[in-house]
Amino acid sequence: MPRSNRNDNFIDKSFTVMADLIVKLLPINARAKEAYVYYRDGLSAQNDGDYAEALENYEESLKLEENAIDRGETLKNIAIIYMSNGEEERALETYQKALDENPKQPSCLKNMGLIYEKRGRTAEEEGRRDDADGWFDQAANVWTQAVRLNPGGYLDIENWLKSTGRSNVDVYF
């Protein structure tokens, strides 16, 4: 039974009903509609913390989805699950796949930077200054791209870039 048919949350159920109506009315093919149902069920499972079910639904959605922007969004959600589970390398690989599908996803770049920055802090705490600088430079690189895609949207990142001396003047408007 699809997750949407067993949702007890009134708001989620209302959203699902409205989304189903919109999908039925849109002039899209059956394959795209089915991909959306899997995506929506994956999102619902992810929001409930059922990551295994979410991943299953997202994988099914990816098998059907042909739109690069929608594929990128699905891959981003998969990467978020990997990141939440501490699977940083898989998360980075999946964020990159999401960006390959849709390069205009600043949140993928932001999250990749979080992983690099965390690795930099760990290396710094362990006294590996050169490694730390390398990780911080990688964080700065992807964060600079994120800020360029979403100016003013990541003030904390902009502040980090400035405070660490890794900012580029052309990033800020």
From Swiss-Prot:
Alphabetized UniProt keyword annotations: Membrane, Photosynthesis, Repeat, Thylakoid, TPR repeat
SMART domains reported for this sequence: TPR (SM00028)
PROSITE patterns assigned: TPR, TPR_REGION
GO cellular component terms, A-Z: plasma membrane-derived thylakoid membrane
Gene Ontology BP term (one): photosynthesis
Membrane topology: Peripheral membrane protein
Localization per Swiss-Prot or TrEMBL: Cellular thylakoid membrane
TPR repeat residues: 35-68, 72-105, 120-153
Chief site of localization: membrane
Top-level taxonomic group: Bacteria
One Pfam family cited in the UniProt record for this chain: TPR_12
SUPFAM superfamilies, per the entry: TPR-like
Protein role: Essential for the assembly of the photosystem I (PSI) complex. May act as a chaperone-like factor to guide the assembly of the PSI subunits.
HAMAP family named among the record's database cross-references: Ycf3
Family: Belongs to the Ycf3 family.
Name this polypeptide is given: Photosystem I assembly protein Ycf3
Gene source species: Synechococcus sp. (strain CC9311)
Taxonomic lineage from the root: Bacteria, Bacillati, Cyanobacteriota, Cyanophyceae, Synechococcales
Gene: ycf3
